[in-house]
Amino acid sequence: MLELFFEYIFPLIIIALKVVAITIPLILCVAYLTYAERRVIGLMQLRRGPNVVGPFGLLQPIADAVKLLFKEPIIPTNSDKILFILAPMITFILSLIGWAVIPFAKGVVLADINVGVLYILAISSLSVYGIIIAGWASNSKYAFLGAIRSSAQMISYEMSMGLVIITVLLTNGTLNLSGIIEAQRTMPWWIDLMLLPMGVVFFISVLAETNRLPFDLPEAESELVAGYNVEYSSMGFALFFLGEYANMILVSAMTTTFFLGGYLPPFNISWLDCIPGFFWFVFKVGFLLFCFLWIRATLPRYRYDQLMRLGWKVFLPLTLFWVVLVSSVLVYTDNLPSI
């Protein structure tokens, strides 16, 4: 009996504990990211931001969560009730399961699979379904138009993201995210320099992928009231909100892994190796999240035609050209990694 327990049940308990150990801190980070956003935007606009609930307003996210929890969930009369309820759950769950393959430090990863990049791409492409279902099930023209915009926007920029990731795979020679980080430890400086423009393109693309300013067309308040989540209240609205911010943290972690060395120190200095890799990972992700907030506070929203033109006529040809350029340079210099 004990053999069966240790062979079958004990590994499942360990996996469940790992999932809880990742999920609970992530939800707390998402809650306090909303607080950080309001504080940063407030400071940039020369005002205080939330500062009433608790010291320095630190309990504001908890107050918001309690408020949304006790609000009445209103379901529109002519909506598809089952899909209407499922849509925010799909969005939130997909934003969490992408973290399964992200390495927080050396050896600290829930599932260190050999196709981690494909897993991340699959999860990011599935996330559009929650938004489409929400727009269609709401039986509202504003929600439906926001959902159509979102699906077109996400599909447009996924093409560029995929080509950017191909350049990363060409230089690192692996689909394993831990392997990508370790390959950057010994990567020549000129390859890092070649990947720099692709890092910028990738970050701009994930801004569009997560529907953040200046690409928040699916929820443009001045045109669509609130976009695909206009009919949602209570925990349905909260789950969409949490899903959006969890996706922000996830794409920041992806950018950190692909272009900033993940948990590696930023410079090859011996005494920096004494600092735990988890600290460097959190620091880099925090910096990218600050860039998200900074961009929201400073840039105006793009027009829809400008958004599509940037995706299809600028980023797609540029990334395609860069894939050819990087592969040609790697073959010419005999630096193409063996797979």
From Swiss-Prot:
InterPro entries: NADH_UbQ_OxRdtase_su1/FPO, NADH_UbQ_OxRdtase_su1_CS. GO terms for molecular function: NADH dehydrogenase activity; oxidoreductase activity, acting on NAD(P)H, quinone or similar compound as acceptor; quinone binding. The keyword Cell inner membrane applies. It holds the Pfam family NADHdh. Its main location: membrane. It catalyses: a quinone + NADH + 5 H(+)(in) = a quinol + NAD(+) + 4 H(+)(out). It is found in: Cell inner membrane. NDH-1 is composed of 14 different subunits. Subunits NuoA, H, J, K, L, M, N constitute the membrane sector of the complex. This is NADH-quinone oxidoreductase subunit H. It comes from Rickettsia conorii (strain ATCC VR-613 / Malish 7).
